[in-house]
Amino acid sequence: MKEEKRSSTGFLVKQRAFLKLYMITMTEQERLYGLKLLEVLRSEFKEIGFKPNHTEVYRSLHELLDDGILKQIKVKKEGAKLQEVVLYQFKDYEAAKLYKKQLKVELDRCKKLIEKALSDNF
């Protein structure tokens, strides 16, 4: 991933960027496989009404793979002779940290936008 600024849309952060941020953080925490990532996200955000779908989570993971940030490894599933599980690990941790840094700037901007809307209208 190049050292370039993430371009802002001028409004709120896109869902895919939001999910990619969480994929990176959960990989740092070694929550390593897709379905587990999906379960954790759904559990974490259930209370506030955000339920990421399977397709968006996997698209986010695949973008991180395409960007060279994550890589997949296949391991045999414990207790199963022929089944494999796909795990995600960092391929380029520096690029992952850069992405998080860029998203932090964007999320701070979005927070200010939302706070202004709440202040101005309620």
From Swiss-Prot:
Q: Which UniProt keywords apply?
A: DNA-binding
Q: Which InterPro entries does this UniProt record tie to the protein?
A: RTP (IPR003432), WH-like_DNA-bd_sf (IPR036388), WH_DNA-bd_sf (IPR036390)
Q: Name one GO biological process term.
A: DNA replication termination
State one molecular function term (GO): DNA binding
On whether DNA-binding is a keyword of this UniProt record, the answer is yes
Q: What does this protein do?
A: Plays a role in DNA replication and termination (fork arrest mechanism). Two dimers of rtp bind to the two inverted repeat regions (IRI and IRII) present in the termination site. The binding of each dimer is centered on an 8 bp direct repeat.
How this chain assembles, per its entry, is: Homodimer.
Q: What is this protein called?
A: Replication termination protein
Q: What is the native source organism of this protein?
A: Bacillus subtilis (strain 168)
Q: What is the lineage of its organism?
A: Bacteria, Bacillati, Bacillota, Bacilli, Bacillales
